[in-house]
Design a protein with these regions (language model features):
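Metabolite-binding pocket within alpha/beta catalytic cores that recognizes anionic/polar moieties
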Residues: 2-134
Length: 134
């Protein structure tokens, strides 16, 4: 999505918000109700199952390209774990599409008046910009 303010009653152009015929956000292939407010993101898609195997139950299992999503219950709390793949481009897609899932009305193609804040936790490794930091 473009980095600009959109009035909540102004329709978002189809080129800026790609929703499939099934009503799912394009890259993640998810419906708005498929995610929890608490989300763990990992780079490697194999880590999704390693984490969700500890869930008490899994209600959503979706895979599209490098994006694997499991949503379920853990100790009475609804959680989503989602793989981003590699690179900042993929993370940008994931974060923008997660935001769209909770803050855009998919029927009207407008932003919701009340916004939902997601709790996103990154689990994994990252490189360093300084050679002396491993």
């Amino acid at each position: 999505m473009l980095n600009r303010t959109i009035e909540h009653n102004t329709p978002i152009a189809p080129s800026e918000l790609i929703i499939t015929e099934e009503g799912k956000i394009y890259h993640l292939n998810l419906h708005p109700n498929d995610i929890a407010d608490d989300i763990i993101v990992v780079g490697d898609q194999n880590r999704v199952k390693r984490i969700s195997q500890h869930f008490d139950s899994i209600e959503i299992e979706v895979e599209n390209r490098e994006f694997v999503t499991h949503t379920g219950m853990y100790n009475g709390k609804r959680l989503t774990v989602l793989s981003t793949g590699i690179g900042c481009d993929n993370i940008d897609i994931v974060i923008n599409e997660l935001d769209a899932l909770v803050n855009i009305d998919f029927n009207l193609k407008t932003t919701k008046k009340e916004h939902t804040q997601l709790n996103i936790i990154r689990l994994g490794t990252s490189g360093s910009l300084q050679a002396d930091i491993p």
